[in-house]
């Protein structure tokens, strides 16, 4: 019995030694390696990836006993994984995200980009290159060339306190449509126009926060238009929810924004000298992209979105490689293409806009300075707030457009806005 036990132990030891040799590349299961790392560095791991069946070559040699970060880097990069620090000693193991980087990357990228231009002339040469390449990489011109020129269908007008709401359905390309709503002041005369792409907030354009903002801006004197994200709302009925997580969504949302402006700017009650764009989160990403694609905008207000180290986590924001334009760019540089026209950034301390006051905003001030118009770029930073479109952020939006478009501040009262149901805001009834 004793000899039998010794033999088994010897066989096990031999197998282990055989497994951990040069010939086997010292390979170990990735899950086992990560468990050992967690014990060594006294951390907890949460997995957003499947490590089943994955083996890591030269596994133990990748560990750096003096650095958890370097160890993670060495172990996870071969699989396109990375470790994201959470609270305390918890780390989340995630799939590599090409649009998401770290603040330190922005701190390196912004000076690099800034070194490419020292005055208005060199900046405009760079700007023109970016503008051309962004259009090409997005593929927007081929889509625009195929667009329908049919007049949009409009629904009945619903009258509220100081404004009206009317739904529309517009044919775009390849038989697709975009649906949305127009919020119009009751007052007669010429009004500024604000295109309002929405982000990934609760209930999309049907949500209370979205309606509060557009209704309030309309009461103060601006015509506001929003529309469904590709694959959300009525667009989901047409193309399915999965279509939102595609590169096509990036193209179609930009196309929809351009075509809606084409239609709205022809209205007799629209003042073409006051055309704005405003959205939050993914809607803020759309806001910046639309300013790069369409020079008819005269004011822009991206909210909780603009960053030099995050391109937008949804394929509808980063599905086409526009950030590779000009040898590599970012949303901050794309936003700079709007200079010297008025732009306000709304940022907070709880998301990727946390670096705006010391990184992206000074960078944009420099670009605006080339035109002697630093007063046209501003930043409202809310360091204690997180990623949302809360009242302080909405108030910043109101203040910006009151100042820029001369809206009637005496009408600023969100309580006067009627919150409609999704069915009321849809052009066609929701399928049961």
Q: Predicted segment positions?
A:
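Cap/lid segment of the alpha/beta-hydrolase catalytic domain
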Residues: 189-269, 305-316
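Mobile cap/lid helix-loop segments that gate and shape the active-site cleft of serine hydrolases
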Residues: 297-336, 341, 348-361, 370-373
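Bacterial Sec-dependent N-terminal signal peptides
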Residues: 1-23
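N-terminal export/assembly leaders
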Residues: 19-98
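Proline/glycine-enriched tight loop/beta-turn segments at coil->beta junctions
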Residues: 160, 175-178, 185-194, 200
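Alpha/beta-hydrolase-fold serine-hydrolase catalytic core, especially in secreted/extracellular enzymes
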Residues: 65, 96-177, 347-432
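Glycine-rich nucleophile elbow surrounding the catalytic serine of serine-hydrolase chemistry
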Residues: 279-291
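Alpha/beta-hydrolase fold nucleophile elbow
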Residues: 269-281
């Amino acid at each position: 019995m004793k000899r039998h036990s010794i033999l088994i132990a010897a066989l096990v030891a031999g197998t282990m030694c055989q497994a951990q040799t040069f010939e086997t590349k010292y390979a170990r299961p990735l899950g086992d390696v990560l468990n050992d790392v967690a014990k060594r560095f006294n951390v907890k791991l949460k997995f957003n990836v499947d490590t089943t069946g994955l083996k890591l070559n030269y596994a133990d040699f990748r560990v750096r006993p003096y650095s958890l970060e370097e160890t993670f880097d060495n172990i996870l990069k071969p699989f396109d994984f990375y470790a994201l620090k959470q609270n305390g000693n918890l780390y989340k193991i995630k799939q590599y995200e090409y649009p998401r980087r770290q603040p330190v990357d922005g701190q390196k990228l912004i000076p690099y980009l800034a070194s490419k231009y020292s005055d208005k002339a060199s900046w405009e040469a760079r700007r023109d290159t970016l503008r051309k390449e962004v259009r090409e990489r997005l593929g927007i011109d081929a889509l625009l060339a195929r667009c329908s020129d049919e007049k949009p269908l409009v629904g009945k007008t619903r009258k509220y306190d100081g404004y009206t709401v009317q739904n529309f359905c517009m044919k775009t390309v390849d038989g697709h449509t975009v649906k949305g709503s127009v919020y119009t002041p009751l007052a007669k005369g010429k009004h500024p126009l604000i295109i309002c792409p929405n982000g990934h907030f609760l209930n999309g354009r049907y949500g209370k926060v979205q309606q509060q903002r557009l209704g309030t801006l309309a009461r103060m004197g601006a015509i506001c238009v929003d529309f469904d994200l590709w694959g959300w709302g009525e667009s989901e009925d047409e193309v399915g929810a999965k279509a939102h997580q595609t590169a096509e969504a990036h193209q179609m949302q930009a196309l929809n924004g351009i075509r809606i402006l084409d239609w709205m700017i022809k209205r007799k009650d629209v003042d073409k000298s006051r055309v704005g764009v405003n959205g939050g989160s993914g809607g803020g990403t759309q806001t910046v992209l639309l300013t790069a694609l369409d020079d008819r905008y005269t004011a822009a207000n991206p909210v909780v979105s603009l960053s030099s180290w995050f391109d937008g986590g949804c394929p509808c924001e980063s599905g086409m490689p526009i950030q590779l334009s000009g040898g590599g760019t970012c949303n901050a540089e794309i936003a700079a293409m709007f200079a010297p026209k008025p732009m306000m950034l709304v940022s907070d301390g709880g998301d990727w806009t946390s670096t705006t006051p010391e990184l992206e905003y000074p960078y944009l001030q420099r670009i605006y300075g080339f035109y002697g118009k630093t007063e046209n770029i501003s930043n409202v930073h809310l360091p204690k707030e997180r990623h949302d479109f809360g009242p302080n952020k909405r108030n910043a939006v109101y203040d910006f457009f009151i100042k820029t478009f001369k809206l009637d501040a005496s009408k600023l009262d969100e309580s006067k806005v009627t919150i409609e149901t999704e069915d009321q805001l849809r052009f066609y009834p929701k399928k049961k």
